[in-house]
Amino acid sequence: MVEKIIVSNPVANLLGDEQTRVIWDLIEKKLIFPFLDLKVETYDLGIEYRDKTNDQVTIDAANAIKRLKVGIKCATITPDEARVTEFGLKEMWKSPNGTIRNTLGGTLFREPIVCKNVPRLVTCWNKSIVIGRHAFGDQYRATDFVVKGAGKLELTYTPADGSAPQKFQVFDFPSDGGVALGMYNTDASIKEFAYACFNFSLDKKWPLYLSTKNTILKRYDGRFKDIFQEIYEREYKVKFDTAGIWYEHRLIDDMVAYAMKSEGGFVWACKNYDGDVQSDAVAQGYGSLGLMTSVLLSADSLVAEASHGTVTRHFREHQKGRETSTNSIASIFAWTRGLEYRAKLDNNDKLLKFCHALEASCIDAVESGFMTKDLAICVKGSVENVKRTDYLNTEEYINKVAELLVSKLTAL
């Protein structure tokens, strides 16, 4: 057996729900703890325990991430009315991801995991496109309402220093009314977004593009453009030049067109709503939503998780004692991306190499023909073309990754 790697500082381990919790347990037992001497602070974010603690456990988990600097999160249920009934919940608890984002702030980076033999819907995407989504403000913190009849819509800003208010005329509504929206962002949050994107690009050694619609929202989107440009010129241009990469602002429509015909290999900084939409479009373009990592990077902490949900349909089969073939790759990458950040904070080169070896083992397994059913369907073109011998079940795939990992670690 390979000697365990000592990890000197702990991480927060956030448990989740349903089938992803099942594979989380397998990942811990077969891919993490046999190889690492690692201390974890565990927080049960399963829906039933969140309900039992009135969601206090989510707040505790977010604060632990702040303190420990690293959180590794399993997918969780965000309850709707049907889930409230199913679990007999006290109330419709908020998304744990939203609570964590509101506590930590930061930027959400979503990156596809590229396997050469998994066909891409956008065939020219040979390298990853990372979406950096500004996870604060805009439509997600907006005030919107229905206007019932004729009237004047105004915006008023009242300075805290007691100086004269500024009033802006927005629209005169006709008698049949309409809808209205007021939204905002802050310089501090935009600056944090910019720093996160520049640092992420430098780390990847990939160019960075910011997309806005500053031709229409001259002041609102213009503020994003100006802040990014100021920080780039002052602090990053020389570093980017040295690394052989660049930063550019592009209009969102131009950027979408460029992305569709590019080969990938860049970081795309998006405002909150744009990032929400484009990250799913990019994920599907690479062929599988099950091959997408997600990290929330704030000024001094990181939370990593899979970009998919709790895989309820597979969990129902698991509950009946039936065989499942659930893709665990994104959940494994949640562990590797979290531990990679821990390794960089601690200057732990052995841990960093372990993370890279585990990621390579996942990809090598798929590229050697060892994969779960969802990927076999992608490779074969349709479910009708897939035989049982074409794929592994949930545990068999993780066992295969463990086998490849041992050989890679032995060779280090």
UniProtKB/Swiss-Prot annotation:
GO biological process, one term: glyoxylate cycle
A molecular function GO annotation: isocitrate dehydrogenase (NADP+) activity
Cofactor field: Mg(2+); Mn(2+)
Enzyme class: oxidoreductase
Catalytic activity as recorded in UniProt: D-threo-isocitrate + NADP(+) = 2-oxoglutarate + CO2 + NADPH
InterPro entries: IsoCit/isopropylmalate_DH_CS, Isocitrate_DH_NADP, IsoPropMal-DH-like_dom
SMART domains found in the cross-reference section: Iso_dh (SM01329)
Binding site for NADP(+): 76-78, 83, 261, 309-314, 327
EC number: 1.1.1.42
GO cellular component: cytosol; mitochondrion; phagocytic vesicle
Binding site for Mn(2+): 253, 276
Site (Critical for catalysis): 140, 213
Pfam family, one: Iso_dh
Major location (coarse): cytoplasm
PROSITE patterns: IDH_IMDH
Cofactor comment: Binds 1 Mg(2+) or Mn(2+) ion per subunit.
Keywords annotated in UniProt: Cytoplasm, Glyoxylate bypass, Magnesium, Manganese, Metal-binding, NADP, Oxidoreductase, Tricarboxylic acid cycle
Positions of substrate binding: 78, 95-101, 110, 133
Subcellular localization: Cytoplasm
UniProt similarity note: Belongs to the isocitrate and isopropylmalate dehydrogenases family.
Quaternary assembly: Homodimer.
Protein name: Isocitrate dehydrogenase [NADP] cytoplasmic
Species of origin: Dictyostelium discoideum
Gene: idhC
